[in-house]
């Protein structure tokens, strides 16, 4: 039995497998195009093609949200739809309804999933340069209606629905 364990630990194959276990995830993060799976319920699609080239035309982005009292874990990546771009007119009314260039894009809930009152992001005006307003399709989607604009520097990858 001990000889079998020694044989395993002295095998080149063992060290190659260990190296692959540690190297593959690192390399996967760096791929220019990859498949990502989201567990969030804020968008109907679950499987996405993501691109490291931020010049790729896409209306979806993978990003790290700004740190607020509603985003406690700063390592969680969000995938949302860009609903309003820089230089667009964003308006929120007294009913917590959001409009981009006069087109309705969503309503902020008064309560979170635990029935606690939740503050919404209030802004009316032209979206500043390099800022984006992102949303999900779920009524309780945790998005820009609560944490505000996403800065271009927070974008990790562009995304397109795979299915």
Describe these PLM feature segments.
Residues 1-79, 93, 126-127, 145-163:
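Protein maturation boundaries and topogenic segments
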Residues 7-15, 103-112:
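Short charge-dense sequence patches
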Residues 34, 85-90, 121-122:
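Short small/polar-residue motifs
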Residues 52, 108-159:
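Acidic/glycine-rich C-terminal interaction modules and beta/coil loop segments
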Residues 60-62, 90, 132-133, 139:
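Generic structural signal for buried aliphatic residues
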Residues 66, 94-95, 101-103, 109-110, ...:
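Surface loops and adjacent helix of pleckstrin homology
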Residues 73-104:
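Mid-length scaffold segments of soluble, non-membrane domains
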């Amino acid at each position: 039995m001990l000889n079998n364990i020694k044989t395993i630990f002295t095998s080149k194959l063992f060290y190659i497998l260990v190296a692959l276990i540690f190297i593959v995830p690192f390399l996967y993060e760096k791929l220019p195009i990859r498949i990502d799976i989201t567990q969030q319920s804020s968008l109907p699609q679950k499987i996405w093609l993501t691109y490291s080239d931020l010049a790729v035309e896409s209306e979806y982005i993978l990003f790290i949200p700004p740190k607020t009292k509603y985003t406690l874990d700063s390592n969680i990546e969000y995938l949302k739809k860009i609903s309003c771009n820089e230089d667009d007119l964003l308006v929120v009314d007294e009913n917590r309804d959001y409009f981009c260039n006069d087109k309705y894009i969503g309503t902020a809930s008064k309560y979170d999933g635990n029935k606690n009152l939740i503050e919404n992001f209030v802004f009316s005006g032209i979206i500043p340069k390099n800022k984006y307003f992102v949303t999900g399709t779920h009524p309780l989607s945790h998005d820009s209606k609560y944490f505000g604009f996403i800065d271009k520097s927070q974008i990790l990858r562009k995304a397109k629905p795979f299915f």
